Amino acid sequence: MVAAHAAHSSSSAEWIACLDKRPLERSSEDVDIIFTRLKEVKAFEKFHPNLLHQICLCGYYENLEKGITLFRQGDIGTNWYAVLAGSLDVKVSETSSHQDAVTICTLGIGTAFGESILDNTPRHATIVTRESSELLRIEQKDFKALWEKYRQYMAGLLAPPYGVMETGSNNDRIPDKENTPLIEPHVPLRPANTITKVPSEKILRAGKILRNAILSRAPHMIRDRKYHLKTYRQCCVGTELVDWMMQQTPCVHSRTQAVGMWQVLLEDGVLNHVDQEHHFQDKYLFYRFLDDEHEDAPLPTEEEKKECDEELQDTMLLLSQMGPDAHMRMILRKPPGQRTVDDLEIIYEELLHIKALSHLSTTVKRELAGVLIFESHAKGGTVLFNQGEEGTSWYIILKGSVNVVIYGKGVVCTLHEGDDFGKLALVNDAPRAASIVLREDNCHFLRVDKEDFNRILRDVEANTVRLKEHDQDVLVLEKVPAGNRASNQGNSQPQQKYTVMSGTPEKILEHFLETIRLEATLNEATDSVLNDFIMMHCVFMPNTQLCPALVAHYHAQPSQGTEQEKMDYALNNKRRVIRLVLQWAAMYGDLLQEDDVSMAFLEEFYVSVSDDARMIAALKEQLPELEKIVKQISEDAKAPQKKHKVLLQQFNTGDERAQKRQPIRGSDEVLFKVYCMDHTYTTIRVPVATSVKEVISAVADKLGSGEGLIIVKMSSGGEKVVLKPNDVSVFTTLTINGRLFACPREQFDSLTPLPEQEGPTVGTVGTFELMSSKDLAYQMTIYDWELFNCVHELELIYHTFGRHNFKKTTANLDLFLRRFNEIQFWVVTEICLCSQLSKRVQLLKKFIKIAAHCKEYKNLNSFFAIVMGLSNVAVSRLALTWEKLPSKFKKFYAEFESLMDPSRNHRAYRLTVAKLEPPLIPFMPLLIKDMTFTHEGNKTFIDNLVNFEKMRMIANTARTVRYYRSQPFNPDAAQANKNHQDVRSYVRQLNVIDNQRTLSQMSHRLEPRRP
């Protein structure tokens, strides 16, 4: 699950604080908070709730820096671990010396290790943190107690020899080859084949429901059919099945989606092509249900027809959730030569979200889309490859888990979904360092074969151009197809272009200036690659470097060529610099007013161009546009209202100003209360982008003494964070009910939250139950749209790389993210403050209706906030309340929950958004997560060169914000004509409890835990 950034540190701190308590001191609310966090962790997703509950009682939290050794090979273990964040290297040495240890794999989020503490066998490997990592630790005595009590639950979850394998062999070492299923290398799976030996119960049931529904509603679809003189018994036609499915439910939006849903049945063998030759296709092909494989298959009884009517929509919802994965597997099982352009695009989109591939360039990912093979294995215990064998493939786990086994040492670790293995043997051309054994049934992998892997690397290198100076690379370009297929002149060869992979800032700028197309209009010239440079240059070439460089390029004169050639070069050079400056100024807009260097550059540049235009007629056509931009920015900067705009105290997002909401700028001033230990406060007036050091100075001036002062962020739950002196724009980073405190360092432990931070004690159900759900959703969307519109794209960049590195504010983004948390906690607060059961049921219905209307208005941010509020443990545990919710609303909620399913990197949400046209308000925390994923998975500099491929990927994500806002939000005419000042005021001034512990306590008082 994704949480908005503004709440992340607070919620993290809260559950960590609970884990830091001694087990005997943990309350039921503490355990609830820990349980909520752990059930989202992959390592625990298959754990029985009772077992996970016990882990919450005895586990400890560890936060380790990069390079820390947890234990060494040969040590006797004392703890079991699960990875919550970060990654760790598994190193093995044949001599037990750490000097010659080889890294055999990496443990990612969700992996667990250390089961050897059950019988005190020595550790089989050395474990070292690869990056800053968070772990859950369970001490040996507690882990043994869990094993004794919950052995039946844990046997299938731990690595052998403690876990249970289907083969029944002793998995402490590699099973004998004669007795263990081995993989036949390079046998491609045909898409028509099933991927399971036995269909799952739920897919069998789904097939039965669909067959009965067809026989009940359209019996003519299942009949004997003749084709080429051959009769096929009791079968259906692919196109007719797609038509029928689209008519049955609104949750099927396209024929492609329906194909994926039928493919789910085909993969399990519940539906089959009559000759076992084809995967499911929207064509005149014959398919037969499993029940119809037998002679005289029975028709559904009246009772079965009734059951089918009741279960059909739930079945459709289930298949719609499973369909995208089945469709992806179907594509990956096609021979690479048969994959269409659309197929390759679908695979490429999937690869963007696989952490093991995050460091690879776009070109390599696109090449991989063409060669990746889907591989599945039905039986646990199958050996994928053996230690010492030649490395022929690289694997990424899509589903399931594997054990990494070394001769004489047994299982050294377990790898899970998203982890990869086998790449080192390909890169180093070395034998396999370990054996890989399937840990469970039905494991799915992506496989890259060695020859394809090496060919891709060779092709990339062959298409790479390196510009060197003094024997050092200064610019690395990659040759790629230009995108426009054949030219109008009949040339069938695709044109090539060069994209920047890496380089020095100066050479990257020089390249983009040289490649600007002067014949294009300004709109056409906003080529996305140049746009990437303009958006991202602040990371590697701040304006203090860019502006002088642009001046130097503008005045540059060639040293060679005829006089005419020199004049032509100089003119075109000037025009290109002007073009880039126009785009740069358009992108930055009002933000330039806060940058003295940029303002001075613009004015001087305009004077230079004006002077040149008198002598060079060709520059005159660009002058008016430059003049317009410079004047507009200069006049805005000098306007009286821009000089010192005082913002609202405490940044209440529900500001009730009548005029249109204006973006907050770093130079705007804020009146802000900073509290002392005794809860008195002093009010300071400082710019929004002020650093903590300057805040301390302002507070010290008011208090008369500032020696040893620190500034502390205090949440309503009492979590305290000391702010660093170079932190900037901290006012908007507070949690909803958070406050700033100033105190000497020795008073830090004595700080306590203000009573007002606790939030309301009475709900507002009496007020908003009278308001229409549609009116509430509409006014929420109007307000969310105002907040979203104020977020500048560059704030996303500052947020990702750290605003302190730019000394810039991200106030508008902070407030928009805080709004997400505000709505989420509003839902939980209102339900937990409602003591009457029947009223709580009405509240659930109300919130589900509001969420549905937000979805209609394409306000996905509020939609997800409401759904996440309803799934908060303080609400989801209210079994009596949920039991009384009508089944219609339960179905709506189940459908909404399926959209926020985090599996496969929130694929359900991504597919939904891909179908929507702007304007829309996105699920902002996920967009932030995507940018952070790219940032943390790729270095900013490689060999002292800017990694421009990383810049391009981050800019591409940030640019989606521009796309979502590319059309104005047109108010609903029926809503806009209503005068709903009361609704407008209500949604802008939500009063919430944001302390999860308090909410859990209230929830337990409403419905105590059942014995």
From Swiss-Prot:
Query: Which BP terms in the Gene Ontology apply to this protein?
Result: adaptive immune response; adenylate cyclase-activating G protein-coupled receptor signaling pathway; calcium-ion regulated exocytosis; G protein-coupled receptor signaling pathway; insulin secretion; positive regulation of insulin secretion; Ras protein signal transduction; regulation of exocytosis
Which residues does UniProt assign to the signal peptide?
A: none
What Pfam families is this protein classified in? cNMP_binding, DEP, RasGEF, RasGEF_N
Ligand binding (3',5'-cyclic AMP): G422, K423, L424, A425, R432, A433
Alphabetical GO CC annotations of the entry are:
cytosol; hippocampal mossy fiber to CA3 synapse; membrane; plasma membrane
Q: How does it sit in the membrane?
A: Peripheral membrane protein
Disulphide bridges: none
Which residues are listed as membrane-spanning?
none
Per UniProt, which keywords does this protein have?
cAMP, cAMP-binding, Cytoplasm, Exocytosis, Guanine-nucleotide releasing factor, Membrane, Nucleotide-binding, Repeat
Complex formation: Interacts with RIMS1 and RIMS2. Probably part of a complex with RIMS2 and GTP-activated RAB3A.
Protein role:
Guanine nucleotide exchange factor (GEF) for RAP1A, RAP1B and RAP2A small GTPases that is activated by binding cAMP. Seems not to activate RAB3A. Involved in cAMP-dependent, PKA-independent exocytosis through interaction with RIMS2.
* Comment, domains: The N-terminal nucleotide phosphate binding region cAMP 1 has a much lower affinity for cAMP as compared to cAMP 2.
Q: Mind telling me what this protein is named?
A: Rap guanine nucleotide exchange factor 4
Species of origin reads Homo sapiens
Upper lineage is:
Eukaryota, Metazoa, Chordata, Craniata, Vertebrata
